[in-house]
Amino acid sequence: MGYETLLHVIREKPLSISEAWVKEYLRDLFEFHFENTPYWRSVSRRLSPDLDEIFQGNLVEVFERIFNAGLAVDEDYLRSHWLDFVPDGYPGRIRFYQSSGTTRERAIGHWDADYLGVLHLYLRAALDEIYGLYKVYDSEHRMRAIAHGPYGWYQDEISELVWSYGGVLYFIGMETDGLKRVLREKGIDAVLKLLDPLVRYTKRVMETDRINTVRSAPPLMSLFEPYRETIETAIISGVGINREFFEYLSDTFVNTKLIPLYGYYLFGDLVGIYRRGEFWYYPNHPTTLVFPMVFQDGEYRIVKRGKRGRVAFVIARPEVLMVKFEDETALRVPPSGPFKWDGFGNPLRDVR
């Protein structure tokens, strides 16, 4: 199944894709990669997974069978052999991106340029449905945005989003290698010193233009406090996002819509909802599935709603298939707002 069909379906109903269609899509993608992608072709020959058996039952059962079939990718192998995950002769427009490197050495993964369109449809629909941004920004009241972040997918994604609202964007690239370690060991002042060019440029922009939208990480939100009266939307993700910080922001940026996102280099940003003191994030079906899992009685199982488990991804696109665990735990949370599927909540890093 190619991007033409995928984009057609997502344009019609980006946040309400049926489970039956997701299963059909996943089955097609697994078959394609088992035949055409070096890594998965090798796995298929070695393990002989029975796709007819794996794709029986509901989506939860399918997800569990994928992991119990031994299909999870080793993180160290992925970091050293990323080219093995590109389909032979793939005709699309591929770009390789890097992870942020805030926690460990950067990983490398690839996107087809058309995936940016899929991701944008999901982001735009979710932000409009949950936060009503389409009511805030239009041709009469333009979005004027500033964003901090690493170059690559992050820059491409936020650019498309701002432009879709008829806005203009200042993108300030930042070096993120080891940022979490610096924050943990030396504190916020050390982070700001490390990012001094970003700090200076941000102040210059804020003093000159009338910025009404910001996209940044928690340690950098203090840069915008002097201008909080004019900031209508703040999109926040990355190191340091937690309940205490979010409540502090709510008290400081009183008239600002605060939007939490969960970012990952292989699939981009997922939209979050802050409710009852928890952050709930929802993947962009059908290309990204996320469930917390536990290993019990010799098998991987998705946890019950409200319980915590290790975060597991299935990323399925024409250009890449990835089945993996993260060194992170999260709660399984029920559908909420416009989302018709389960999400994951309050992720916590669990460095192994």
Question: What is the predicted function of each stretch?
Answer:
Residues 99-100, 260:
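Active-site neighborhood of phospho(di)ester-bond hydrolases with catalytic His/Asp-centered motifs
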Residues 119-145, 179-188, 197-207:
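Conserved ATP-dependent adenylate/AMP-binding module captured primarily in the ANL superfamily
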Residues 130-177:
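Conserved AMP-binding loop of ANL adenylate-forming enzymes
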Residues 1-24, 28-29, 167-352:
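Active-site glycine/GP-rich loop and adjacent strand/helix microenvironment
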Residues 116, 151-154, 242, 319:
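Alpha-helix N-cap/loop-to-helix initiation residues
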Residues 1-98, 104-141, 150-151:
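Nucleotide 5′-phosphate-binding alpha/beta core
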Residues 113-114, 161-164, 275-277:
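Short secondary-structure boundary/capping segments
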Residues 39-43, 157, 222-224, 244-245:
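Phosphate- and divalent-cation-binding pockets in alpha/beta enzyme and binding domains
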